[in-house]
Amino acid sequence: MVRVFYYDEETGDTIDSLHPEICSKQKALSLFTVLSEARGSFFGLVDQNGNVLQFICLNDDKWRVDKPIPKEKGAYFCEASWNTCKKLIECIYDNVPIENYVYLEFELF
């Protein structure tokens, strides 16, 4: 079971990250598809193990992908296109390592 949180900078629509909602793969992809590409919009997933993957819009078709690792006091990250982000969302639902599709760098918080 995967849970979702998001915030749309243009519309103000949100699911709070403190209370993410269980969401099917199709619904998650649909929510991401209608999310505005306004700077500051974000979308996040929490997998069944509590791992978080979040996408923050930087500008049209440019997203920062973050995979926080609190015990390492940092996050793995990359920049990706909207289409790549959709593929990464599918990876979470299909239990496929996102590292198969993107190279992630590590940075401290």
Feature-to-residue mapping (PLM):
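Short glycine-rich, low-complexity/disordered patches
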Residues: 37-51, 97-109
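Negatively charged, low-complexity tracts enriched in Asp/Glu with abundant Ser/Thr
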Residues: 1-47
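Short linear sequence motifs
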Residues: 12, 25, 35-36, 48, ...
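Mixed-charge, Lys/Arg-enriched low-complexity segments
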Residues: 73-109
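Intrinsically disordered, low-complexity regulatory segments enriched in Ser/Thr/Pro
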Residues: 2-11, 51-80
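Short, solvent-exposed polar/charged micro-motifs at secondary-structure junctions
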Residues: 15-17, 52-56, 109
